Structures are given as structure tokens and as C-alpha cells.
Amino acid sequence: MKFTIMSKGDQSSDTLASTMKEYLLDFGFIMDEQEPDIVISVGGDGTLLYAFHRYYNRLDETAFVGVHTGHLGFYADWLPTEVEKLVIAIAKTPFQVVEYPLLEVIIRYMNGSKESQYLAMNEATVKSAEGTLVTEVEIRGEYFETFRGDGLCISTPSGSTAYNKALGGAIIHPSIEAIQIAEMASINNRVFRTVGSPLVLPKHHTCVLKPTAGMNLQITVDHLTMVHQDVKSIQYRVANEKVRFVRFRPFPFWKRVRDSFVADK
């Protein structure tokens, strides 16, 4: 089996990554940064996001597992003290692969140039680079509303505990194939109205934004931030691809939610 390790880059993470590499090589595994079967992330959820975007083009062949060296992560489920146990599990234990839904983002342009396509594991956001975002919102090909405000956040179920939650969105279990649209400071008065509530769209339902012409847009996809010009539309939907995680033991989603947001530290 081929593996690679991605580290957060701090001293403790690099030390753990080096130790795991030596252990796995001793077990006869092959280090392969180009076409790994397993990607081990050592750091936090941010490190795993970087790993996902590094290998997004081979999601059917690659599975991820995380060791968190910082705060409790939603994706990184092993502690630094459990590194030897994890290595033995990888080497000797049949593992389960769990799949989570992803968000597909397609940006089309006024001048007809080639569209830009992205996959998000957590969320994608859109804001105006100059001020208030004004955009038509279409759902399933029909006009829904005209949004005016700071921006919109479109998240995956596994990303619903991140920026989406801070915006008042719902937490969605990652077994549900859906995306969620949450508003950022929408303008609502006697003249301008939005639905004013997060929207959950099931698989095969598509959301298309059609921003005001000439507006420069600041678009994020997970940790990536870009400015796009002459945007005709932005399409969001549940992606056909899924991200795959290696599981050697139960990792209950609702327990992670409770430990992160409710339980006493």
C-alpha cells in the first residue's frame, strides 16, 4: 500500500509525521506523494483541507485519515499519543471507508471564456470586492429572490459546523447528501427582501447566482481566496465526487459536535 503524510509544519507535527513515516516504511509500505492510497494528515482540520485540495483529482483512489496536534478536529480523529496504535491499525486491520458529500462550484463568465470548476469540502463563499453583493438567486432553474447584503455561504454537511454555523445555519449530518445556503448580513426593509433563513438543498437541486454585471467578486473555496471579474453566474450543487475517510473505530458525528460546542472542557 502506498501512503503519504502531510504535516501542519510546526515542530510537534513534523516530529510525529517523521515517526509515522519510519514506522510505516518498516512495515513495508511505500511512500508515494504522487499517487497515495492513504493520505495521513498531521495537524488539524486545516491541514486536512490542504491535503484534500492537493489530491482532489484522485478522490476515488485516495482515502484520508487525520492526527490532530492542536484542538479537537472534525476530520482529524487520532491523538498524538495514539500514533503507534494508528500505524498498527493501518498495517494489520481491515479498515472501513466512510464517504462524505462535497460541494461543486462552477463559475461562468460574460466573455464566454472557459468556466472555472472547484470542489469544496467545507464551504464556498461569495462577496462583492467593492461593497454590497447584489445577485439574483435561482433554485432548480427558477428565480427565487434577489439577494442584497455582505455575501452568501454555501456549505457541505461536514462543513456545516464551520462558517455556516457562525452564520446561524443548521448542523447537518454528513450522511445527508445536501448543501446549505446561509446569508451574510442581508438587507431587509420595505423595499428589499430576502427569505432571511438558511436553505437546505438536496442532491440534484442546483443553486445559481447571477450577480450584477461588472461586479468584481471575492470567492472562497475552503481556504482558497480568489477575485473573479466579469462573472456571469456561479452554480452550486452536491458534487458527484465524494471525499473518503479511513475509519478503524467509531467516530460519532454528534459526539464530535457535543465535544466541540457543548461539553465542558
UniProtKB/Swiss-Prot annotation:
Source domain of life: Bacteria
Active-site residues, as the UniProt record annotates them: D45 (proton acceptor)
Gene3D superfamilies in alphabetical order: Probable inorganic polyphosphate/atp-NAD kinase, domain 1, Probable inorganic polyphosphate/atp-NAD kinase, domain 2
Residues the record lists as binding NAD(+): D45, G46, N122, E123, R148, D150, A185
SUPFAM superfamilies according to UniProt: NAD kinase/diacylglycerol kinase-like (SSF111331)
Gene giving rise to this polypeptide: nadK1
GO molecular function, one term: NAD+ kinase activity
Purpose of the protein: Involved in the regulation of the intracellular balance of NAD and NADP, and is a key enzyme in the biosynthesis of NADP. Catalyzes specifically the phosphorylation on 2'-hydroxyl of the adenosine moiety of NAD to yield NADP.
Pfam families per UniProt: NAD_kinase, NAD_kinase_C
Catalytically driven reaction(s): NAD(+) + ATP = ADP + NADP(+) + H(+)
GO cellular component, one term: cytoplasm
Coiled-coil intervals, chain numbering: none
Family: Belongs to the NAD kinase family.
One GO process term, biological-process aspect: NADP biosynthetic process
Annotated protein name in UniProt: NAD kinase 1
Lineage, highest ranks first: Bacteria, Bacillati, Bacillota, Bacilli, Bacillales
